[in-house]
């Protein structure tokens, strides 16, 4: 039987930690900046902290766009932006080398924004940080529809357990905003993250993957002891 009081306490603790992480991230946002904002609850808290700043926002997340507009922020269409001062995002896992794994399915758009950003920082609590990625969530592979069968076969040859992502609110499979198929691929015992990502990207018909390798410039991590930042090739330091 679930202890509701204990569950409520855990959820409240997580919320407080996420708000603290967002608060420290907001201190990096200055007037005049173009800011990239991903998706998730921590980003929602960040929007609340920066809503009164003179900034412009780009986002791959429709929910984030709607919330930012509701809060009075100017949202730009990514199509017309070629530079972002700083971008923040969440992830399912991040490791000590700043490799990250996401499962939201909007990774191609997230990477476009990351490529424009001077800084691309993930905001996480300690449950998301691992010395190396665990791959407990799937690698999402975005595939051109006509390449579905051949890519699926190649993924299975790599010992990937492939699932066609389906829509929870309608019959049929789920497609990306660009009209491509999303495959959830579960891998066990990944030894070389970089090699896996390169192998996937080299498959004809693969648009991109939800593995973020050599993309993050930093992470802000919150735990019971405080808020810490880590930059590429650096150690954690307290904020």
What are these regions, as identified by a protein language model?
Residues 2, 6-89:
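N-terminal active-site beta-alpha-beta segment that forms phosphate/nucleotide-binding
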Residues 2-9, 63-66, 71-239:
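Conserved phosphate- and dinucleotide-binding cores of soluble alpha/beta proteins
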